[in-house]
């Protein structure tokens, strides 16, 4: 199975005034977006939208255990329009200079059901599920690709581990006969320990191992933005280090309505339903977080203020995936902001030191939304040793309307999810500079799908 680009992010470029009626496009005092223009309705829109071709809940941010700083991402996504779900989970341990990550695909009908993987009924408790916490087979990792295997006569068998019914298929390089990947089409059930993976065929040398990873999100009916229980496990792709998150998350204040309205129209309305033609987006940017992170058996009690995105609707195609650059900031003065630059139309990949126009959505401490133009400058290029993609580790963001200059700096260089296609950079960053003419600082995030 060829892994498709796993993209999430700030949708599509369009003229600022057209996208957000009432948005300020000058350097005069920015005008707030009227609250009545928002199409987001909570708690209903916190739930699954079963007709949406794409949907995800994405938790990121900075957590601390005393002086020890961690960046994390827990992303559960459904691309039912392309026939799969996926998770991306990562942890950056800044002091140890370590980054743990894994991307996992889930295929229907046994791996995930796009109609039931999350709760759609607003009269029930909210939940999201990818993977099974109680069965230790979620994916299969090729540890040695071997050579000489026949694409039509190679089988994968799952044995032991106390479970049954697992089914897996190999993807074989037709030229070399190497096992490129193994797709687990049915994870089976009841695997209380990692099962053995056996590859048979006329080739030789290929080996693989079982991987356990999962995401669960739960909250009580009524206001599911409160006391969200997010539990997740990743088995690091490079080292097999196990990382477990057990977090409780509660939003304080109003949601962050992206674009001020929460929606942008992508395709002609007559070409499908509103979920098939529009992109819907809101965030929770003042999330009080507490819980534990366990790294290879070592437990850290953590707290912090984190960020959640919920996006659903139309989001590109496999043939024309969206590419973008994004920075998020949660400032100590109570403001939150998200800047994005979409690589589409006349927007090309910026060169180091080249200022480019961008669009910034901001929220003040009282919850009022603003959308203004900005200028973004990328610096400090870094080449991923895994994918060969060149990312930027520093960004300067100038927001004239708010007399602001913010500098985002990645706290660790290597924070990539490397993939055969569609690698993406997701990383903890600092955010420092000035805002409304006064010194400002806070936690930051850098995202790059290039």
Regions found by a protein language model. Name each.
Residues 6-7, 11-133, 211-450:
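Structured soluble/peripheral alpha/beta segments that form catalytic or ligand/cofactor-binding pockets
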Residues 134-212:
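Conserved, function-critical positions that sit in or immediately flank catalytic
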């Amino acid at each position: 199975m060829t892994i498709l680009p796993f993209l999430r992010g700030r949708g599509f470029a369009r003229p600022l005034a057209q996208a957000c009626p009432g948005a300020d496009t000058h350097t005069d005092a920015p005008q707030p977006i009227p609250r009545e223009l928002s199409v987001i309705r909570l708690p209903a829109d916190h739930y699954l939208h079963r007709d949406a071709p794409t949907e995800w809940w994405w938790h990121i941010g900075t957590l601390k255990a005393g002086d020890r700083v961690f960046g994390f991402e827990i992303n559960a996504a459904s691309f039912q329009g392309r026939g799969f779900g996926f998770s991306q989970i990562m942890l950056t341990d800044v002091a140890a200079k370590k980054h743990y990550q894994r991307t996992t695909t889930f295929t229907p009908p046994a791996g995930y059901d796009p109609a039931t993987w999350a709760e759609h009924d607003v009269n029930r408790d909210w939940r999201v599920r990818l993977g099974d916490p109680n069965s230790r087979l979620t994916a299969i990792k090729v540890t040695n690709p071997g050579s000489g295997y026949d694409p039509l006569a190679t089988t994968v068998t799952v044995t032991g581990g106390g479970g049954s019914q697992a089914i897996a298929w190999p993807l074989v390089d037709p030229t070399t006969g190497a096992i490129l990947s193994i797709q687990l089409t049915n994870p089976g059930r009841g695997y209380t320990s990692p099962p053995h993976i056996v590859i048979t065929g006329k080739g030789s040398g290929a080996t693989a191992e079982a991987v356990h990873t999962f995401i669960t999100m739960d909250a009580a009916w009524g206001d599911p933005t409160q006391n969200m229980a997010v539990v997740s496990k990743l088995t690091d792709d490079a080292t097999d280090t196990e990382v477990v998150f057990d977090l409780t998350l509660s939003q304080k204040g109003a949601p962050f309505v992206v674009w001020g309205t929460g929606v942008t129209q992508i395709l002609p309305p007559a070409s499908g339903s509103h979920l098939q033609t529009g992109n819907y987006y809101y965030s929770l940017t003042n999330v009080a977080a507490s819980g534990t992170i366990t790294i290879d058996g070592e437990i850290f009690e953590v707290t912090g203020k984190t960020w959640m995105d919920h996006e659903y609707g139309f989001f590109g195609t496999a043939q024309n995936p969206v590419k973008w650059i994004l920075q998020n900031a949660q400032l100590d003065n109570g403001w939150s902001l998200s800047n994005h630059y979409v690589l589409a139309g006349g927007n090309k990949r910026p060169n180091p030191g080249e200022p480019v126009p961008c669009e910034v959505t901001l929220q003040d401490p009282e919850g009022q939304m603003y959308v203004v133009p900005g200028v973004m400058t990328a610096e400090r290029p870094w080449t991923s040793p895994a994918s060969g993609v060149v990312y930027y580790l520093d960004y300067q963001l100038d927001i004239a309307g708010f007399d602001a200059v913010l500098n985002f700096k990645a706290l660790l260089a290597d924070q990539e999810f490397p993939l055969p296609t569609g690698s993406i950079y997701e990383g903890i960053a600092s955010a420092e500079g000035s805002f409304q003419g006064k010194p400002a600082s806070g936690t930051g995030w850098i995202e790059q799908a290039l």
